[in-house]
């Protein structure tokens, strides 16, 4: 995910908290790999990765304002699907 894409997801202008947003973007691939087993190299091929990345980014960025229960349930469901998809890559 690029900084521009992240700013669009978060509905913020570039230049506002760019360092924070970039650090969250940088954390996404390894977080997804750790929680699902889907290697970073395989994440590019999975459309759900972009969706769950946007949701995670929203949850992390707006931690004190996000509707945590509904958003967390959605994120957890998508991470479970990606875990199943990771098994296809891992054999």
Regions found by a protein language model. Name each.
Residues 1-91:
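Divalent metal-cofactor coordination and adjacent catalytic microenvironments
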């Amino acid at each position: 995910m690029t900084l521009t894409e992240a700013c669009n997801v978060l509905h913020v202008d570039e230049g506002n908290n760019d360092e924070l947003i970039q650090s969250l973007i940088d954390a996404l691939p390894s977080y997804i790999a750790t929680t699902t087993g889907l290697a970073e190299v395989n994440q590019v091929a999975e459309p759900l990765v972009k969706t769950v990345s946007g949701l995670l980014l929203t949850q992390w960025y707006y931690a004190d304002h996000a509707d945590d229960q509904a958003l967390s349930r959605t994120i957890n469901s998508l991470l479970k699907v990606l875990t199943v998809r990771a098994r296809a890559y891992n054999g």
